[in-house]
Structures are given as C-alpha cells and as structure tokens.
Amino acid sequence: MSWRSEQIWIELIPGSRRESNFLWAFILFFGSLEFILVGTASYLRQNLIAFFPQGMVMTFYGISGLFISLYLLSMLFWNVGGGYHQFDKTRGVICIFRWVFPGRNRRLLLRFFMKDIRSIRIEVKEGFYTRRVLYMDIRGQKGIPLTRTDEVLTPVEIEKKAAELASFLCVPIEVL
C-alpha cells in the first residue's frame, strides 16, 4: 500500500504480519498442544500410546512446537519488519523506518539525502529459486533493499515499481 502526491511518496511495508504467518503460527500452536496432550495422557497411563519412548518424544516435540509458535506469535504482535519508506522532495530527504525486536533500539530509522542517491538497482537471480530485489544505491554505502527478499514479483511488476520510483527521484535504473 502506498500514498503518493507531487512532492511526497509514502510506501507502507507490512513486515511479519502476513496471512501465511498467522496461519502457520496458529497451526503450530494447536498442533503442539495436541502433542503435549497425547504425551501427558501417555504419562498418566491412558492407553493411547506407550510413554517410553513415544510419549516422551511427543511431549518434547509439543514443547518445542509451543516455543516456536510463541516466537511466531510474538513477531506478529510486535510487527517485526513492518514500517514505511518516505520519499520527500520538499525537504530532499528519504526516511526508511522499520520496527525490530523489542529492546533499546526497537525503532530503526535511516535517513538519506536525495542528492546522495546514485541509482535504483534491480537485482535478478535466476535459477530454481528466482529472486528479484529492488535496491536503492547510495554513495558511500551498500545498496538498501526496498522490497522483501521473499516477495515474489514478476519482471513486469518490479520494472514498473523501479520505473515509478526512479522517475519520482530523478535517478537512473540499473539492472544486474
């Protein structure tokens, strides 16, 4: 989702709050609860399965799955990776904001001057896992990714996005 005017372009980044992450977190949570229940029932001498070794292994897998699902749910709650890109022509500043894990530096804010932008770069890696990533090259620094690395974009979509951004920022496009 993005908002654009003549002088300002704001693009919202969803981060970890995607439908697939919600789905996997809840499937893993309820599946691990079932494993814990079966393991506990076998420990309490219910005739589902023998406690040693099947019940112990199922309890271990249930506890492991519970921790992983709590990690995924906490990432969803904190919206890790979410934020925005703001391109402001009036001030000549680009702001890239992201939420990261809680702590002292929970907010990640990068600011650059528009005059320091060298180009908008499209990096394409073909093969079994085709990857197309849009980068912003800045003088004296590495390229900053503007799209998620796991985001699957068609060549037309990424070219359109790069062309719009390059025309808004008045910089060239590079394709690698």
Swiss-Prot record:
Membrane keyword on record: yes
Subcellular location: Plastid thylakoid membrane
Keyword GTP-binding: no
GO process terms (BP): photosynthesis
Pfam families: Ycf4
Keywords: Membrane, Photosynthesis, Plastid, Thylakoid, Transmembrane, Transmembrane helix
Record's bilayer topology term: Multi-pass membrane protein
GO CC annotation terms, alphabetical: photosystem I; plastid thylakoid membrane
Domain of life, per lineage: Eukaryota
Physiological role: Seems to be required for the assembly of the photosystem I complex.
Family: Belongs to the Ycf4 family.
Protein name: Photosystem I assembly protein Ycf4
Originating species: Cuscuta obtusiflora
Taxonomic lineage: Eukaryota, Viridiplantae, Streptophyta, Embryophyta, Tracheophyta
